[in-house]
Regions:
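Charge-rich amphipathic alpha-helical interaction elements
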Residues: 1-111
């Protein structure tokens, strides 16, 4: 029954990871939105002040507030993607243990 308990434990962990995916996704979307808004405002300001369009984008991205927002976006994206990878790894571990459980207990019908 150790396999059964381990499978149940992983299923619970998977449920928690799926629930946290929503929160991480919202955080990522919010960080992306904030970055895009700051970048747009800075580009508009630079264009209004006569900055050539060819370099305005690079200058805008170099402004501290915009760069900080981009850092936040990239950080939350990394957390979101790591959460997705964790979910996939948990699903794979569960599947491997289910197959092992089926072999040991002779269950050919699956769960």
């Amino acid at each position: 029954m150790d396999l059964y308990n381990e499978i149940n434990s992983l299923c619970i962990e998977l449920e928690h990871s799926i629930k946290s995916l929503h929160e991480n996704g919202v955080n990522y979307a919010e960080a992306y939105k904030n970055y895009r808004v700051l970048l747009s405002k800075e580009l508009l300001r630079l264009k209004t002040n006569g900055m050539p369009v060819t370099i305005a984008y690079d200058i805008a991205r170099g402004r501290k507030e915009v760069a900080d927002a981009k850092f936040e976006e990239l950080s939350t994206e990394a957390i979101y993607k790591a959460n997705l990878e964790n979910i996939n790894a948990l699903k794979l571990r569960i599947k491997v243990l289910e197959n092992q459980y089926d072999k040991e207990w002779g269950n050919t019908n699956g769960w």
